[in-house]
């Protein structure tokens, strides 16, 4: 026991009892500190609630004057919900009394404070208002105080106390849940550790190695084992008389097709006469393309094993990815439905009208990304666009196409060079809704002058339960794997911000599609011919995606049609579909062959920057393509004509004989026609070339597909023999039919610098011509220089013939721009 004062003993009975009231502070009944002569304790209620203990201690430290003010305002005493106030004490009722109290060294003990609670009606009224608005303004507080007979400060502090009480309750509930979750995680961790100790090796049955093994030790051990295996294979081959294959490199996470060819040795093509000292790589380092009739594959990944190890998402990252996916769907929906101020219209001197642009400041305010500041370093440019259209396909079929990488790349073959589903993170709870995929894609422009865009991204699909609309959103993965880079070494960087589409079903199998395309890209090596085309968003913008989607949906609808009455030489609907599939492979092969997809490198034939001719070589030895060495040449020319005019002239049979590289001056005759869209230019034709060498057993045929939309047009050809066409129409496998496509790509562009634009002037276009020839039937052959000269002459002649025909039949947009149109290679 502790003895204090004059023998007063502190016990459990009198520890919290109020001291007796004495007339003088020097009375022996007053408890004083024997060493410091502190002010005596004041009397308090015998029971102080736990919630009020901290506030009463604070009141003691602030002094009586502050205590009196707080008591008067109802901010102290009682519970937070009661709103009780202290009755005014005459001893401490004014400022003079407070001053006298400070002057007196030992003031008499204060009288016991009296408290009273608010009435039930007052509490009910304030509770009702609190449920509606926990933060009332001054007018509401004054009105409520007048109705309840309270002071405004009392109402103010009651609401403060009530909010504090609610916050404390929420914190306590959250702490309880966190503790429970922590206990569950600890239990699960213990369970997993126990299972880990019991694991055994599936090969030898021995126990697993506990602890982490350094990566460099594993790498050294693997190298040693491979050297030992190679040595044993060499010894075994001496005794067996046949070569023994050692163990192949470890398979990557994404297994390429067995048909995928590896990089072939150099063709050793001497290009020193044409190639000068410029940064383009030599054509002696060209790679062979994979067969295009199968799904899109990755190139050889032996140099990217470290990348593959970091590719997949761990379990804890999957949870974060799902949270990001839900927020990205909300962002996409808001970007589709919101106009100004998120999207603003700006005048464009290039097109002579207005364009829709994203307000970056408003976007950053509405959708702050945690990694935004780090990713915006360097020369990143933001490309954002949105559009909407109606397509002839229901939402279920569209969603299925977007979730299947092969179908997606097939539908957008002019944009998507290849695509792959890397990992299925979530397959959805009910149907496709809730599916989350990790994907890789390479996007292309149909020209070797524009580098492709490669990116890993997450694709999430969600259906709105109320409206039934589908949301398909792509968002970047760099928040999970900052070190993940595209597999090919490229000179630019590309990242997909939340982009995608909202699909709404309409009657008769149609769908309303709203599309938003939002990316950040660092383009450094786009040729000046395509610089404005790419920068304006016409190459990868939302309008281009929707234009291609509309056209492809019409093509698929035509492919599935069964009520075709006039089939011509095509005997059945099944034969019609087989010809359409063969033609689709023709277009897809052409698109990939004339771009920089799959890491193709191209060589320029001149040192001038305005030269747009590029050549490349490939060794072909796979089914579906002719065997041997293929030489490909591509050239791009600006023309002062609309892409519709150029498209119509090339398709016109009266002018097709001018294309010597295609028909050798002979006029073609259409023997079969398949319409695959509402536009008459969207069709497949089987052409018979009228030459003297034709006979009943030797007929030259050419398969042609043409397609056009607002984003551009394509015309692709390939010679085929009669037996191959008959094989396709009979329903046999057409993937082995060798095709070597050549053709034209036409895209609308804005006029170049220095040319005025008015509202009556149609847009100009870029004409890209791609020609492929089989230089040799032997894959190991080395094409000579004359082959390169020949294909270059054919290319220049084709461009000149088209330009001359356009100038003679169509009035150009700008008469004084003839000099600009002469930029084709001479």
Curated annotation (Swiss-Prot):
Keywords assigned by UniProt, alphabetized: Coiled coil, DNA-binding, Homeobox, Nucleus, Transcription, Transcription regulation
GO MF annotation list: DNA binding; DNA-binding transcription factor activity; DNA-binding transcription factor activity, RNA polymerase II-specific; lipid binding
InterPro entries (alphabetical): GLABRA2/ANL2/PDF2/ATML1-like, HD, Homeobox_CS, Homeodomain-like_sf, START_lipid-bd_dom
Distribution of this protein across tissues and organs: Expressed in shoot apical meristem (SAM) with higher levels in L1 cells and the epidermal layer of young leaves. Expressed in the L1 of apical inflorescence meristems, early flower primordia, carpel and stamen filament epidermis, ovule primordia, nucellus and chalaze.
Biased segments, Basic residues type: 110-119
Keyword Kinase annotated: no
Coiled-coil residues: 165-189
Low complexity composition bias: residue spans: 23-34
Bias (Basic and acidic residues): 88-105
Record's GO cellular component terms: nucleus
One GO process term, biological-process aspect: maintenance of floral organ identity
Pfam family, one: START
PROSITE patterns: HOMEOBOX_1, HOMEOBOX_2, START
Region listing for Disordered, in residue ranges: 1-34, 69-119
Compartments, record wording: Nucleus
Function: Probable transcription factor. Involved, together with PDF2, in the regulation of flower organs development by promoting the expression of APETALA 3 (AP3) in the epidermis and internal cell layers of developing flowers.
Protein name: Homeobox-leucine zipper protein HDG5
Source organism per UniProt: Arabidopsis thaliana
